[in-house]
Amino acid sequence: MSLIVQKFGGSSVANAQRVMNVAKIVTDTYKEGNDVIVVVSAQGDTTDDLIEKANEINPKASKREMDMLLTAGEQISISLLAMAIEKLGYPVVSLLGWQAGFNTNKAYGSARIENIKTERLQSELDKKKIIIVAGFQGVNKSDDLTTLGRGGSDTSAVAIAAALHADRCQIFTDVTGVYTADPRKIENAQKLSDITYDEMLELATLGAQVLNNRSVEMAKKYSVELEVLSSLVKEPGTIVREVAKMEKMLIRGVTKDTDVARISVVGMKDIPGNAFKMFSKLAAKKINIDVILQSVGRDGTKDISFTCASSHAAEAVEILEDLFGLEGAVVSSDTSVAKISIVGAGMQSHSGTASKMFGALYEAGINISMISTSEITISVLIEKELADKAVAAVHKAFFG
């Protein structure tokens, strides 16, 4: 007998027919003699709809009250799935995050899981029940409901798998695995049979929508092997593990991220500590910085540009104007950009990867404004309107 954790996203339970389809997948797993814990997201666009309703009432609602509202979405989906499983004649219980033992910190809207008290989960497993858990949520030390942020249900599933030492953690989505590019936009995108944690983490961070990056971080930390597969099509998916078994491809994927802003500070004084002052202030406001470019002038000044999420652009500009505006520096933001990235451990042992990528963009007539590299990633900043064209050109260069 194995313990299987299964996670189903909002699209997998978007309507009654899909809820019944998920119930069939879950009960088929249970019939094989397995213990089953299922983590479910809110149906379809429920979370977005709830946010819209909140904004109609109070656009500046507190994060605590927003979390109270948003946890309602998962409560609906877990109860409907439990009803579907009951209809099929199987023992089942649905649990909210706090009932399942999820304890978090107090960061409303983006809470971190501190621990899971597994007694209730283990008790229900001992009764041979299928357990349906609301993803994306928990409770803090003040007994307030909290949410884990976008993609938090992936993290909930991995956390349960780690806490109970599950034999498998399956992440069901609307695609059949992890692909070399978005298969809905690139016709010859190839499905990967497996991928390393590090490669998957880079893909998730750089714009791939298949897995939440925090869930991959947790899976790597606790050695939870993940399987990404479709709830709509029955076929093998992609395994995410420490070491990929398939022969290393040069790269594993091409991603685009259009939620990007380029922030530029032009004419700041070229003195020790200014860059530290800049990035420490941004870090204090939890603004994550990615690609960085610095150029030094001949008049005792320097220019620094960097990228961050477009949602943080206005706040970043305000911080930097307060820091350097009186010195005569000019701060600006540009959200008409996109980041195109390639990811793959294979590039560590192969030369010419960057030139191949840059050549593909050149042939497509696409200019590069910024470049960032790591051991397994190369990212470039380009015009946003050319993002899809760039992904297609780079994918063709590496995969044909």
Please state what every model-predicted region is.
Residues R168-F172, L226-V228, D290:
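Short hydrophobic alpha-helical runs that function as membrane-insertion/retention elements
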Residues N34, Y90, V224, I287, ...:
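Short phosphate-binding/catalytic loops that engage adenosine nucleotides
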Residues M1-V216, I382-E383:
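Nucleotide/pyrophosphate-binding catalytic subdomain
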